[in-house]
């Protein structure tokens, strides 16, 4: 009897809760957005508009009609959202906690305007919202397309895998060509090796005529087969060149992937330092004759540009730059130079901002 009573209570409680969910309307939908200071890419109003645009906003629904998993899924479709967790209360409150992605740099090159997040996720900049991170400009062209949003690493892996698949497809196309070429060579060899033997009762004249006809046939056959084999060779050469281009493209993609990773490493180094994180506003990228990535920096202070050179010896270069800031710039003034270079090992090279007594030479400062 006790077990039956407990079971009845449980069933009634469940039915009551279900009835409540079916009648209780959503009384409030609040969105809490967690993000790093200075990186406000979205706000609560923007996310409310996002949910309404996707037809999943819970206003006017009962608790039973609210699909929390769908709400979270739609939130994650927003490129600036890293994590989303939704829940509801008995009183009709639906609440969602959202964690924003943390941008580390912003590409503004060749029609691109994209953020790169700390987790490697890439997404387009959104009107009305901005993160205070270094802006990357110059002649650097990103590997991803202008409409791309997603993981950079996954994009590279997919791109390289696609090229490897195409290389494999080219290899498969070679097999029937090799087969037909080998058949043609075998047939050509067979005809070239063929002879007509003189029988006991065959006259010399008839044998000579047969041999002459055979030679004419061999010549014509060899011409046809040689042309056929030449076509096979051209097809194979075309496929091999296609594979070579794909291998070259893979090498180029890996090189540019390395450049991108070095750029991430470089920017992360800047952002970890409270002074340089606030001082560096722009990263200008160019390319050396050897194809190496070169960097110039635009600081917030002064009217000069910092020629950083290749992304190497990062800590040493910034140490030299810090000493120069402290020992030289504070003495001569922030507008004394138009360019400060730390690309050369062990020294800081400066170009004066103003001609002095007709001298426009470089000045070396250690």
Sequence positions of predicted segments:
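Lipid-handling modules and contact-site tethers
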Residues: 42
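Charged, solvent-exposed interaction patches on well-folded alpha/beta domains
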Residues: 1-33, 45, 51-77, 82-366
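Structural beta->alpha junctions
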Residues: 33-39
